[in-house]
Amino acid sequence: MSDFTPTEMMTIAAARALTNDDVCFVGIGAPSAACNVARLTHAPDITLIYESGTVGTKPDVLPLSIGDGELCDTALFTVAVPEMFRYWLQGGHITTGFLGGAQIDRFANLNTTVVGPYDHPKVRLPGGGGAPEIASNCGQIFITMALSKRGFVEKLPFITSMGHGEGGNHRERLGMKTKGPTRVITDLCILEPDSVTKELTVVSIHKGVTREQISENCGWAIKFADEVIETPTPTDTELSVLRDINARTKKAHEAA
């Protein structure tokens, strides 16, 4: 089972970033797939929390939304949304938040609000939901997005969820005590913020991908770390788990 798609590589690389001890606030879509692959492989005791208030959920299929009944059915317990945000999130009980977005800039700020001017946008996006609070209050943030010039842009038209702001110690100057984004996992590479400037820097390149491909698909002059490794390819077990849960999800949603 050596063949895999760029999306599978991205999902599995994201799953590997999680540990067995994490308490993770999970976003819908790619973050949900990554978190559940981690739970079904190397991190069986990870605690997955969704915005709707489900704690310790272990879904057999991936949810379509935070209100999917599968999340409540398999949760250890469910709390009200105000408690979820005030006690769990703002109370500092969540180690890792997993987010995606429509657009991201070099300092890992995210836009899920509008493309184009706010008053007259070309596209109006779904909005932030709980993402701004997640980005501010989780111990650290992982982001999953496909690398493209459309998504990785020089300047965001709107900042929905703050990453590292203008770079440097911007979060600290605003009184934010959490780390913010520590890793961005894409279908071509993995990026981490520079320790000083906080600009996203390529630290790992997926097998078969070139530096030229990465540069061509980014909206700014992307930087590479002094030492860049090759991302380990997915194992047969990782691919099997991911494909099985995707197949179950497709079947369940087609039958619904």
Task: Annotate the PLM regions.
Residues 45-54, 72-76, 122-126, 205, ...:
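Short, Lys/Arg-enriched charge-dense amphipathic segments
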Residues 227-256:
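Acidic/aromatic/glycine-rich contiguous surface patches that form carbohydrate-binding/processing clefts
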Residues 5-6, 80, 119, 254-256:
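Alpha-helix capping and helix-coil boundary motifs
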Residues 18, 22, 38, 42, ...:
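Structural signal for hydrophobic packing residues in well-ordered secondary-structure cores
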Residues 1-75:
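N-terminal active-site beta-alpha-beta segment that forms phosphate/nucleotide-binding
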Residues 62-225, 230-237:
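Conserved phosphate- and dinucleotide-binding cores of soluble alpha/beta proteins
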Residues 9, 21-25, 223-233, 256:
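Flexible, glycine/charged-enriched surface loops at secondary-structure junctions
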